[in-house]
Each structure stands twice: as structure tokens, then as C-alpha cells.
Amino acid sequence: MIEIRDEQPKDMEAIREVNVRAFGQMQEADLVDKLRQNCDDLLSLVAVMQNKVVGHILFSPASIKSKARTVQGMALAPMAVLPEFQQRGVGSELVRTGIAELKRRLSPFVIVLGHAGYYPRFGFQPAAVYGIRSEWEVPDDAFMLLVLDESEMRGISGVALYRPEFT
């Protein structure tokens, strides 16, 4: 059984290990540390199985800058699961739980730069469908948006901006 809960201070080392092992490099783990250090408005969840942290997902503030106005929402990045626990629904539970919490917090959207074959099952669509593009050069099918509040997002198009820690 998978338990999804908010990260706790005792989880920091395990979260770092999950990100390093899942991505095979330090970049994502370092990003998590920088965001945690510089940003108070994060949603950081862990997946626990057999009393072990086996997955992690982080949502951080993002914005979409339109000609008319700027809308504040959240970005999903990174999401990681230990290799030996992949293909067991851990990532899906992390994403679903995170989205539910962001809806509760009234976030109007979530953006993700990720696998085009994975994230649509949660309702993500290419952001280009909404006239929204990333601040970086990325494939249209990999940059996706999940609208959580239609009324807040009505008429919004433009550039999605991540926090400076991402650059």
C-alpha cells in the first residue's frame, strides 16, 4: 500500500536519494534543495511504502504572463520514484494527490514539462492548445497545462514562467 503525505524534515535525505536515483544525476535533487531554501509556497509530497520514502513530487509557484494580466499557479517539477518501485502506481498517486491538494488551495493551473505519454491521463493537455508557451525552447507536446479553474484561466494566453531556481 502507498501512503502519500507532506514531506517532513526527517525526509530530506531520502527525498534527495529518490531524485538522484530516479534521474541518475544531481540536478533535480539540487533544484529541490534550492526551491525549499528560497520559496515558502511549495507543495512537497512523499510516497511511503514499507516505511520507506520511495517517491517524491514537488509543486512550486509559476505564472502565465498574458497581455491582459498575469495569473499565478503552480509548476510540477520534479516528480521521482525509486527505480525499483516504478511501474507500481507510485507516481500516479503522487500526481493525483498533488492535483487534489492544489484544487483545494484554489490554484488555477498546473504546468509540467514532461512525458507526453504520461501526463495526459491526469488531464494535462499541450499548453499550446491554450496559446500558452514555455519560456524555454521545448517540444509543444512535452509542455503541458492542467486547468483547475476555468473562470480564472478564461482568455489567458502567453508565456509560462517558472521560478528563477529552474534556470
Annotate each PLM feature:
Residues 32-36, 131-133:
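Short, solvent-exposed loop/turn elements at beta->coil junctions and helix N-caps
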Residues 60, 94-98, 126-130:
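Short acidic (Asp/Glu) patches
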Residues 76, 81, 87-100, 112:
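Conserved acetyl-CoA-binding loop-helix of GNAT-fold acetyltransferases
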Residues 63-75, 86:
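A conserved beta-turn-beta hairpin within the catalytic core of GNAT-like acetyltransferases
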Residues 42, 141-144:
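Short hydrophobic/aromatic beta-strand or adjacent loop that forms the aromatic wall/cage
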